[in-house]
């Protein structure tokens, strides 16, 4: 019986585990894994193809080749299972044990593991406190190392050459011991007392002051503590036994023609065994030391190559001069085990084919070719055939299917019914790249796809292919149906907009049908209902665009909500509309008013329409509505018959004159340049400006001419109406093309760029209708070619960014409903340059309020803290003019391993509060990565056209209200009575009658204020003006000018104006000054009062000093009298170097990698008063004195622009030296909220420029992951080391434990890690190793004996479990709860049994309660 049961033992449930630990294996551990020692380098006998005994494929060690058959054939078949054959020594068992049984090689001499030696920082070096070079010299037998100095003056671990060694031996005899090779290193490692070392290091860390030492000790301490904690002995880094991989994992495959294909590992193992055997023999023969040493070195090298080929010295090569693939190469990189096999598996039950359009499908359907369906659903069909009794065996069923008998097709129809399939289009950039559909069987070989889902898949029908996958199990089908069905995914997860928006033909049809024309056929008629309109239209009595009056029945929501009352009631009203709109009103879902259709439907409008439908009528009605819109759009587009011809491209009549005028202006500039009035650069900039303006003007003229057409109205008068020109309609509706493209067809092509990004100053004045000449065509080719090259580069870069983002966020999942925090971030409307870039409603929609939202007028609470702000809420808030709302964000969430639903808010792809289990991290990464390919790659050179457009010279109010200045605004009144601004960061606000901020404008230094604080103004009033071309240097005090260090030819040069003959002094660039002395001085002005004394800053002993920057034109003379507010010098903005602005993808990557910009601006470290100390060579010294009187110094390069002045009070984190901000400084000085605002706004700027909408919360989620580690400042009583970086949740858990035990918790600083760094420093070594730098990650983890708790998604995919997100999260929770209850039940039963029957150590107890 037992033997019978043994048969069923085969199918074991794989073991359930919750964590994976990695460590170093001790020699004994390796021997315990092994099934025998591999003694010979032979593989198989090439005549018999049987493995050699004791060789690399030995059947005795690794198991039989055929199932249940020993090698010599004495025992065959199942009945001998488990017998060990006495002839060949092979155990009779399954052949697949050859995949899991390991062997070993006993090394004749120990060998260092190359990973722990060469993977930087060298772990061996850290433990031994020796340099890598020294250890290498010892290991590779170039030097001796002292192991035990005995009574000699030598030091332990001292390195000596062979010569030294022999001299010392002569001197001291065998007083001391020195060794070579791995034996020596092993001895040293064994002699280390880790506990003792850790103690001394900790005390030294406390006592030392030097930065470098602290760093060095902390590193070493970390490694030693890791050994101490993990219980791994350091000498295990030296191998005495080498494990041998099971043979099936390094197969030897016979090719035809008697040759073999072999895995490189076999070669590497053969070398090790050969050298090892040779060394054994040499040792037995007592060969000379030098020969043995050489052999040992070769063995070390052979093992190095096996473990990580090419890590040290030249890589071992095979017969074909190709480096052999070692164990390390097997797991790392794109083709390694992690990314190729564990994260990138192939899928069974799948097919792929070309897609074609399926306009007759419903949104949730796809057309599946019959042949493909037959193949995909084969197993189901077999089953049905057997159940129905058509076929008795699988073989018969197979035959039926192959012959494609009629019964098979009937069964296929039945099997496929309500069995969804998943369609995927590569590249899958976001979750809408895979959606489920119900298959509809079709003839032909192409898959039919519904047109509305194309936007989500980013698919078109120019030959795209898609893959089909079949969910097999019932659970999989259910999830596909409820979560992935196309009709359940109608919103983009990136921004919550509808994804099923019509495009192209559909838009054109709807637009054409909803346009109105003057004096169309049947204008002015009235109809009693829509059916009458349709009849009139079908009888050609009216045209689609004619204006008519129609009685329209709308279904409106019933006010009466009592039981049994209908949800919608009809309401009839008369509308002035057009025939087309009236006909379309038929398909409106109940609950939407006709007014949403009563306008020309352009693409944006249709999107808004579908969005409104979704919010008001729910998912189901929206899907039906979208489908009907599509059907109508296609039908109407066909009826419209819109086509284009050359005559539709109307070239504007004014083009000739506009271009002629421009050419004249350019000639004039050339003349000025020839006579030396303007520089070459200025001429070029001006020419480029003229042509870009001309191009605009021609384009504008063209659009004006194209967009309207003359028409005779009903009264017989001529009037103009919006044009029915085909090209104009296509662009206007958003169906195809844009104003820019039309400009190229009918305006002028304009300026072209060279491949390096600079603009060619000769424009293409022709357009495509007129045709290009050869030169113009040639210039055009530049752009086209660069476009293609850019696209390829962009795709790769964008993919890499997405990969890094996914990796850093993959373990962020919503794990609870509410973390209960009251923290949040104050959200305001985003205003730039006085314009609202993003309204408050868009920023808070779908968020949870962190504190009560209060009506500013009545002070009543509108929405309590914890309320989800939906569309109605944000409309209320906007209507009441509330301009700041505190909302919960992912950054302030206090959930430890994950996020809570309240802090995240609405799930944008579903339109309701996010569910527990949603993998919000991955969604965020996809939302940011997916539009990456739309971003530009280039860095913009600001200069010429681009900067000209951006120069403003005044600022005016856009709304009525009161002017308010911010605290940092300072100004002086000059002799003319004008107010001149002298603050660098002043801003003017405009507030409305209740004091709410409506606009905010930056007022630059040197501007003249036209309105003062508190002034009531009307919209359009100018607030301030300034000179856009120069930046002034202004004095705040009056007096007599006294120059210092202003020497002609040294620090300044005289420039004489060619035209006017006037001379000015210009400050020379530091780098161009001749003498060393001149480089360190700074030209400046002091002021003298009437008595000739220096004017002091009021309230201080400091004299007023006003420095001149490089390039400043000094406008005052030495000894001149100046008044307050007078200009001393001007800096032409042209002479400021054109800063390259990194835009597009590189900018996004730069922000997420948290790179510090070069020439970053400097922020004030403390709050205090500014003063200037003694200048050093080339640097000026800025001192901030804080409130306690401590001084903080900054050294600033002289050419930098200082934004503060003597005596100014600055706040901590305020910018004091101009330059791009450094995110690390923002975090350190202004905190997490300011950092998050900075990163979110900067990333959004890049995407907004390309017109891409991404919700802020996705960026916040990534910032949260970048902040997930903290740096320990004071370790208290915790197990951390000061300066160590640890996971935030780990730190908080540890601190909670300390507080519970009444010990001192640790203090810490927040640190910002770039996404790559953050991915690599994650606590999960499996996830980090599969991302980048596999060797380093695994080495580190092995030494620390790290344990991976499998919290993230990636680790679980790799080990092949359900991921802890979505339904998987619930599954794991339930499984853990069951294990817990099982354990408790087991304990309880055990306790009861002990109580009743007694245990060996104690007799049973008497029942305490008396029997009842």
Curated annotation (Swiss-Prot):
Cofactor(s) needed for function: Mg(2+); Zn(2+)
InterPro entries: DNA-dir_RpoC_beta_prime, DNA-dir_RpoC_beta_prime_bact, RNA_pol_asu, RNA_pol_N, RNA_pol_Rpb1_1, RNA_pol_Rpb1_3, RNA_pol_Rpb1_3_sf, RNA_pol_Rpb1_4
Membrane-spanning ranges: none
Classification via SMART domains: RPOLA_N
Keyword Disulfide bond listed: no
GO MF annotation terms: DNA binding; DNA-directed RNA polymerase activity; magnesium ion binding; zinc ion binding
Location of region: Disordered: 1393-1412
Domain of life: Bacteria
The entry's keywords: DNA-directed RNA polymerase, Magnesium, Metal-binding, Nucleotidyltransferase, Transcription, Transferase, Zinc
Gene Ontology, cellular component aspect: DNA-directed RNA polymerase complex
Known EC number: 2.7.7.6
GO biological process: DNA-templated transcription
Cofactor binding, note field: Binds 1 Mg(2+) ion per subunit. Binds 2 Zn(2+) ions per subunit.
CDD domains registered for this protein in UniProt: RNAP_beta'_C (cd02655), RNAP_beta'_N (cd01609)
Enzyme's top EC category: transferase
Substrates-to-products reaction catalysed: RNA(n) + a ribonucleoside 5'-triphosphate = RNA(n+1) + diphosphate
Pfam families per UniProt: RNA_pol_Rpb1_1, RNA_pol_Rpb1_2, RNA_pol_Rpb1_3, RNA_pol_Rpb1_4, RNA_pol_Rpb1_5
Positions contributing to Zn(2+) 2 binding: 819, 893, 900, 903
Binding site for Mg(2+): 460, 462, 464
Recorded family membership: Belongs to the RNA polymerase beta' chain family.
Quaternary assembly: The RNAP catalytic core consists of 2 alpha, 1 beta, 1 beta' and 1 omega subunit. When a sigma factor is associated with the core the holoenzyme is formed, which can initiate transcription.
Function: DNA-dependent RNA polymerase catalyzes the transcription of DNA into RNA using the four ribonucleoside triphosphates as substrates.
Annotated protein name in UniProt: DNA-directed RNA polymerase subunit beta'
Species of the source: Burkholderia mallei (strain ATCC 23344)
